[in-house]
Amino acid sequence: MYSLVFVILMCIPFSFQTVYDDKSVCDSDNKEYMGIEVYVEATLDEPLRQTTCESKIHKYGASVSNGGLNISVDLLNCFLNFHTVGVYTNRDTVYAKFASLDPWTTEPINSMTHDDLVKLTEECIVDIYLKCEVDKTKDFMKTNGNRLKPRDFKTVPPSNVGSMIELQSDYCVNDVTTYVKIYDECGNIKQHSIPTLRDYFTTKNGQPRKILKKKFDNC
């Protein structure tokens, strides 16, 4: 009995130390670790095609192709990278999620200086382009590549950068909703965290709750 208690007590400090070592990256005085999540919901003019999901991650951006639609995201003046791409499809709609991972779980990590962080809050642009990968001679071609006009445009507070999102859509896209979140990855560890930045764009009325609840499969 006593030996069992001794073993348990010996293991507890080791467990705490392991967690602390994993997250000690957050103790840096001259680096900030920011994460990003970008959600896209795009509804096409016709049911989705049966295609194989393909994704690519490159420096300061990523793209995913599925259902006859390619969604590409480029991060300009954000100093951030994506590490995962997820997708979900339903009838005529493609849902995509681009996200980074915590700094203690992956390399390379999204680290930046304080000067970079200031530039991010002032100049970060999330450039989203929706490109159709279906036959353009089909009768359902409507907008001929023109940019969608938003019926409802708003930022989701708190946001101190105004609109971060720039979006351009191809001819087959009927409606689109996008949501961007940039957050302090060490926010739950540090005493003072950096405020989260959020932005939201949609061509239809509503909030992005539906898009956030979808189950995304890695692509």
Swiss-Prot record:
Glycoprotein found in the keyword field: yes
Domain of life of the native organism: Viruses
Signal peptide interval: 1-16
Any one GO CC term of the record: extracellular region
Induction cue: Expressed in the early phase of the viral replicative cycle.
Compartments where located: Secreted
Keyword Transmembrane among UniProt keywords: no
InterPro entries (alphabetical): Orthopox_35kDa, Pox_vCCI-like_sf
UniProt keywords, alphabetically: Early protein, Glycoprotein, Host-virus interaction, Inhibition of host chemokines by virus, Secreted, Signal, Viral immunoevasion
Pfam annotation, one family: Orthopox_35kD
Glycosylation sites: 70
Family note: Belongs to the orthopoxvirus OPG170 family.
Function: May interact with several cellular chemokines to interfere with chemokine-glycosaminoglycan (GAG) interactions at the cell surface to alter chemotaxis of nearby responsive cells.
Protein's name according to its UniProt entry: Protein OPG170
Native source organism of the sequence: Vaccinia virus (strain Western Reserve)
Organism ancestry: Viruses, Varidnaviria, Bamfordvirae, Nucleocytoviricota, Pokkesviricetes
